[in-house]
Swiss-Prot record:
Natural source organism: Sedum rubrotinctum
Entry comment on modification after translation: The disulfide bond which can form in the large chain dimeric partners within the hexadecamer appears to be associated with oxidative stress and protein turnover.
GO CC list: chloroplast
Reported cofactor(s): Mg(2+)
Binding note for cofactor: Binds 1 Mg(2+) ion per subunit.
Keyword Plastid: yes
Protein name: Ribulose bisphosphate carboxylase large chain
HAMAP family reported for this sequence: RuBisCO_L_type1 (MF_01338)
EC number: 4.1.1.39
Its job: RuBisCO catalyzes two reactions: the carboxylation of D-ribulose 1,5-bisphosphate, the primary event in carbon dioxide fixation, as well as the oxidative fragmentation of the pentose substrate in the photorespiration process. Both reactions occur simultaneously and in competition at the same active site.
Length: 450
């Protein structure tokens, strides 16, 4: 027999500290918490093995392939500052292990099996470096930031949105009315809630019809292009595509998808359809916290955001930064840049473990949504800049005078902040004053500020 059977240490094969990473490798940074007594090198090597070619023993078919060409390699390990028994293990995967243009296959390979591994107490995927050669096999976002601005004819400011509430229970006609009021007041977009699909109280086709009516009516009144994120998420891919086709037939500008609950395969199909048919695609991240909330186990949202840019979407929810802890701000802005920019430098203070080159893959607009209102507008304008969508749900619909005045208040606040910024004023310091000044000209804003 040419080999010894039996259990062997992973680090003999898969821990290669002198490996020079290739430009075509997919690189991963894992936060590893080994079980007591397991050395970090063994834990890191185990991750590399289990997420690539390895199994727990030598098998005779190993002789039929070139392990050196196909194995994942743990090439560097560093302790995590301030945590005991946590390490960052860097793993390099040869590109040949992955199917072209498939986020699904990339995740199945890298995170499919290894998270249940006994030698690890916990494991978190912190970041991925996607090589240019692999990026080029993806279509990416259907349109991207610049094309979206051209389609909507809106420049030099963030876009404004609003989720229609109450999210469940309205009839289609009343729902359409709420959409119309918001758009008429000055918002660019309104949004289906992520769990509005096609329930007994409001079937999807009725909702699409009444929302389209609201869009056309408000466009005629305001002279601006309007949109409503029609949620096409469904129980089957076929049904999802049927909804997207109907949206296209109505001539509306944008549809929406829940990419984690719907799955990457469905999302990529929808993104391809959207590019072929001129629809923008808004992405909601329902279920993300199940995956990304634990600090020591799961997948960091920046990886899910990168995956979405590859799979395809023109907007994605990315948190608000406002009112959160300071440390969160840098981390959030780190993955906001990963969504928007062509080239992002490695910067550990912002949680970016690798330099990422997206070559010419279109960018994604980050969406700030959840618990924000007009007083946050100066901070949001400063933090997110022009290329973003700011969504005020309760902040619009909670206005004492109704939806349209609520929309007016948000639009006035936004225009005031953009104008102040363009005049060189400091939004962080003078924010409240800027909003108060604008209140003098807008009774709607004044009412919202009380």
């Amino acid at each position: 027999v040419g080999f010894k059977a039996g259990v062997k240490e992973y680090k003999l094969t898969y821990y290669t500290p002198d490996y020079e990473t290739k430009d075509t490798d997919i690189l991963a940074a894992f936060r590893v918490t080994p079980q007591p007594g397991v050395p970090p090198e063994e834990a890191g090597a185990a991750v590399a093995a289990e997420s690539s070619t390895g199994t727990w023993t030598t098998v005779w078919t190993d002789g039929l392939t070139s392990l050196d060409r196909y194995k994942g390699r743990c090439y560097h390990i560093e302790p995590v500052a301030g945590e005991e028994n946590q390490f960052i293990a860097y793993v390099a995967y040869p590109l040949d292990l992955f199917e072209e243009g498939s986020v699904t296959n990339m995740f199945t390979s890298i995170v499919g099996n290894v998270f249940g591994f006994k030698a690890l107490r916990a494991l978190r995927l912190e970041d991925l470096r996607i090589p240019v050669a692999y990026v080029k096999t993806f279509q990416g976002p259907p349109h991207g930031i610049q094309v979206e601005r051209d389609k909507l004819n809106k420049y030099g400011r963030p876009l404004l949105g609003c989720t229609i509430k109450p999210k469940l229970g309205l009839s289609a006609k009343n729902y359409g009315r709420a959409v119309y009021e918001c758009l008429r007041g000055g918002l660019d977009f309104t949004k289906d809630d992520e769990n509005v699909n096609s329930q007994p109280f409001m079937r999807w086709r009725d909702r699409f019809l009444f929302c389209a009516e609201a869009i056309y009516k408000s466009q005629a009144e305001t002279g601006e292009i309007k949109g409503h994120y029609l949620n096409a998420t469904a129980g089957t891919c076929e049904e999802m595509m049927k909804r997207a086709v109907f949206a296209r037939e109505l001539g509306v500008p944008i549809v929406m998808h829940d990419y984690l609950t719907g799955g990457f395969t469905a999302n990529t199909s929808l993104a391809h359809y959207c590019r072929d048919n001129g629809l923008l695609l808004h992405i909601h991240r329902a279920m993300h916290a199940v995956i990304d909330r634990q600090k020591n186990h799961g997948i960091h949202f920046r990886v899910l955001a990168k995956a979405l840019r590859m799979s395809g979407g023109d907007h994605i929810h990315s948190g608000t930064v406002v009112g959160k802890l300071e440390g969160e701000r840098d981390i959030t802005l780190g993955f906001v840049d990963l969504l928007r920019d062509d080239f992002i430098e490695k910067d550990r203070s912002r949680g970016i473990y690798f330099t990422q080159d997206w070559v010419s893959l279109p960018g994604v607009l980050p969406v700030a949504s959840g618990g924000i209102h007009v007083w946050h507008m100066p901070a949001l304008t400063e933090i997110f800049g022009d290329d973003s969508v700011l969504q005020f749900g309760g902040g619009t619909l909670g206005h004492p005078w109704g939806n349209a005045p609520g929309a007016v208040a948000n639009r006035v606040a936004l225009e005031a902040c953009v104008q102040a910024r363009n005049e060189g004023r400091d939004l962080a310091r003078e924010g409240n004053e800027i909003i108060r000044e604008a209140c003098k000209w807008s009774p709607e804003l004044a009412a919202a500020c009380e």
